[in-house]
Amino acid sequence: MIDVIKRQIFSRRSVMGSVFSTVMLLAGTTTAALASEPVGFGAGTTGGAGGEVVDVSTPAELKNALCQRYQGYTCIDDTPRIIRLNTVIDFTATQGTTSTTGCVYADRQCAEPSGKQERVLDNGSYCSGRTTFPLTYDNAAKSLLSVGSNKTLIGLGASAGIKGTGLSMTGGVSNIIVRNLSITDLNEGIVFGGDAISIDNASRIWIDHNAFARIGRQMIVTGWGPAKAVTISNNMFDGETAYGHYCNGRSSWIMLLIGEAEEITLLANHFHATAGRSPEIGTGGMIHLVNNLYTSNFYFGATASRDVNLLAEGNYFNPEGQYFFPVASTPGDLVFAPLDENVSSTGSLCSQTLGRSCVTSYTETGQESFLLDTTVMSNIAGNATWKNAIGSVRPMMSNDVAKSVAANAGPRADPDSVSR
């Protein structure tokens, strides 16, 4: 049923033309995944509240509303502003194309009907020793829109969005909200063809109720600068693609979180038809992966690290028969991921650290990689910001996640329509 819903919503010729109709009322829980304010690390983010309300409908209007003042290439526009879209703003072909060279980076050759061949731009050494060929990409997808501090970008209704380019938050910008939009079609099938959202040295960010599909590089990327006080909630990450690293119609380029000292809550998102990087983490900091739904996934879900703390709780993994490791980890990685099968060994550690019990995730595959490294909990206990942000989230049980997240992730007619 979930696959049918996704095909209806993410048609390859239109962007978010319908809205989920099922509403789950989660009585008795206080997880604010669907509320009008962020919880977790991004709590307190207000965006453009109190500022001018600007309605935009063209590429030029949107670019100007997001940032009106620059210092060099850095946006320094910190004027509070609420920017509203009620349509899809298409940047495709607005900046022309570039013809260059590329190669096939994967070790396998894809052919119809299993999937078109994924290509990579000839950047760095990626095409070293490989056969190169002419490759043309759309420039707008690699020229992201700069977002200034104190901005809210929100779609009115379920059919608003940005096509053909993404958003960049860098240079120390802070207090930004991106809600209820689709961001799609950035050089699909061309690796390094553009990111949907890039966060590099930015803080206090809430990315909520958006949908991402057919992105050339990452749907969300952080790094190498800090990405602090970030909550990513209620989003649909749809990996269905005509291309694919593994020739199976699933994207491997979903979310790469490699910001310095990052602090990110990933709450109630839907990762569908992915084949890795959901997310991949590195560099340093804390990631709270909570109440996310995974469907029809292949190979890796979250990829752990020895440098970043990962607390994974209350997630629901349903790869639908695919070869899949929900949490890719090895001993020594900083992972604390309780399951029903191992949670008894933690004793009172969660309640002592967080002021509440940890919530177990559900999976039928890869259970051996759900580590319980108590170093993660010690690190949380020793960091007041982490302890408060994680402890403030009240996860729902994993058996409620599938219906709730499938019904509510992505853009909606009213993103605040579901109450607790």
Label for each model-derived stretch:
Residues 149-159, 174-185, 203-217, 227-247, ...:
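Right-handed parallel beta-helix
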Residues 17-29:
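Bacterial N-terminal signal peptides
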Residues 1-11:
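N-terminal secretory signal peptides that target proteins for export/translocation
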Residues 60, 88-91, 158-159:
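Acidic glycine-/aspartate-rich tracts in secreted/extracellular proteins
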Residues 281-283, 288-420:
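Extracellular beta-rich repeat passengers
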Residues 67-78, 93-152, 161-179, 185-202:
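Extracellular beta-strand-rich solenoid/capping regions of secreted or surface-exposed proteins
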Residues 34-82:
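Acidic Gly/Asp/Thr-rich repetitive segments characteristic of extracellular carbohydrate-active
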